[in-house]
C-alpha cells in the first residue's frame, strides 16, 4: 500500500467545545502523520468552494454559514490507507448513526453539529488539500518512531 494524504477539519462546534486535543490524539494514536495544521475562520468564498458539490441543495447556505461562524482546525494527515481509515475514525455523517468509538459517535450532537469533516475519497482529498493549503504549508518529515508504525 502506498502513502496517501487526506484533509480533515475540526468544525467550529468542535473547536468551541474544546475537542481539538481529543481529535488530534485519535489520529496520532492510530499512527498517522500530521503534515499540515492551521487554525482559521474560513471566508465565505473558501466555504462555498469547499461545499460546492452541495451548491444546489437546500442546506448549502446553512453549511456555509456554519463553517464560517468561527475558527476551524484544518489538517492534512498522511499514512497508508489514511483516507478510508480517517472515514472510519470519524464515523457516519449523522451522529445518531455513528458507531460508538468513532469521533462522531462519541462526541457529536446532531448532523448540523457533527464536529468534524474528512475527505471522502482520493480525488476529494487532493481537491480539499489544495483548496485549504499552499504546498509550502505542508511539512515532509519522518517521525522518530516510524519503524514502529509500518513495515
Swiss-Prot record:
The keyword Protein biosynthesis does not apply. ATP binds at residues 11, 59, 87, 93, 104, 114. It is an enzyme of class 2 (transferase). Keywords: ATP-binding, Cytoplasm, Kinase, Magnesium, Metal-binding, Nucleotide metabolism, Nucleotide-binding, Phosphoprotein, Transferase. One of its GO terms (molecular function) is ATP binding. One of its GO terms (biological process) is GTP biosynthetic process. One of its GO terms (cellular component) is cytoplasm. Signal peptide: none annotated. It catalyses: a 2'-deoxyribonucleoside 5'-diphosphate + ATP = a 2'-deoxyribonucleoside 5'-triphosphate + ADP; a ribonucleoside 5'-diphosphate + ATP = a ribonucleoside 5'-triphosphate + ADP. Pfam families: NDK. The keyword Cytoplasm applies. Its EC number is 2.7.4.6. It is found in: Cytoplasm. Homotetramer. Major role in the synthesis of nucleoside triphosphates other than ATP. The ATP gamma phosphate is transferred to the NDP beta phosphate via a ping-pong mechanism, using a phosphorylated active-site intermediate. Belongs to the NDK family. This is Nucleoside diphosphate kinase. The gene is ndk.
